[in-house]
Amino acid sequence: MGLLVSNGGNMGKYSKKGLYSAYDKNHKERDALDYYSTPTEEVLNILETMQLDIDGIILEPCCGGGHMVKGIQQYTNAPIIASDIKDRGFRDDNITLAYGQDYLSDDYPFFIADYVIMNPPFKLIEPFVIRSLEIAQKGVLMFGRLQFLEGQNRYKNILKDNPPSDVWVYIDRVACFKNGNTSIKPDSVQAYAWYYWDKTTSTKETKLHWLWSKKHQ
């Protein structure tokens, strides 16, 4: 795939032991609370809405059950690398898959990609964004709670100097399913948005957009 692999990268205060362990030492608790699958149709929805011209390698660093990857594949034939700290059974011979990979560790093998597209665990959203902005050469697209835009730490560590270029706020609510289990209706539905950092521009302005989910189009 022509991907340059190294063990470099500078995560400053987040390096050394890996950010997963730094933010939450209890893997079982984190796994139980933080894996919520992204609706595949909403991945296609945002890519079609943005009309993102993807030219290069895409990295999905927390692929879970492959819901995000499947949406990307419906939009583009660009090469995809997908990884996760846990093997949830997702398989696809058309992409590069790497399980048992801690995205926030200094040992993570994929340190350069053109795009990062992800829905990170919310408790780790800050270090995931920081790492993604280091890795991505062209852009970072993230699905996450609207709550990401608030908070002193996130403002200080990310939003002040690296605000997203565009934010698409859902007009209606989108359901994400715990542990990827679509047979269990979520107890509550969060307010979500898509965030895009355009690495090809130096602008620090953020454009705000509104987005209907696929079910209301």
What are these regions (language model features)?
Residues G2-Q217:
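Class I S-adenosyl-L-methionine-dependent methyltransferase catalytic core
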